[in-house]
Amino acid sequence: MSTVTLLGERLAEVGTEFVYGGETDACEGCPYREQCLNLTEGRRYRVTGVRDSGTLECAVHDTGVTAVEVEPAPVLANVDANAAYAGSKASLVGPCPYTECPSHEFCEPDGADFDEEYQITEVVGDPPHDYCMLDRELQLVQFAAEE
C-alpha cells in the first residue's frame, strides 16, 4: 500500500530508494509537517509515483519538496549462510570495520538494524566479496519490505 508524502525535489523520481531519517530542527514550525513527517524513521522506502502538484519551499531541501507516493522497500543484506533460507527469519551478523570491502553495504545495510530479525524473501546468492576479512560464511539475501 502506498503512502503520499513530501520528498526533496532531487529525490522525487520513480524507483528512487531512501531511508527515512525523521524530523530535523529545521522542520520546527513548518506548515507541511503533517504531510512530510508521516513515514517510519529508519525504514527503507521506494518512490512509486510522483504527483503533479508543484514544488513547496522547504528549510531542509534547498530545491523544495514535492508530493510522491512511496512504499516500503526490501533490503539486501548479508546473513550467516547457515540461516539463509527463503521464508526463514535471520538477523545481521554484526558490525564490520572493513568499510572498503565490496560487501560492507550489505553487512551494514541502511534500513536494517543489528538487533532485529527479518523475514527472508529470497536468497540472492554469493556476496560480492571474494573472502570475508572476519572469516564469516555469508549469503546475500533479500529481507521483506516492512509494512
Swiss-Prot record:
InterPro entries this protein is in? UPF0179
**Taxonomy, superkingdom:** Archaea
Q: Name one Pfam family in it.
A: UPF0179
Stored PANTHER family: UPF0179 PROTEIN MJ1627
Q: Which family does it belong to?
A: Belongs to the UPF0179 family.
> What protein is this chain from?
UPF0179 protein NP_3406A
State the species of origin.
Answer: Natronomonas pharaonis (strain ATCC 35678 / DSM 2160 / CIP 103997 / JCM 8858 / NBRC 14720 / NCIMB 2260 / Gabara) (Halobacterium pharaonis)
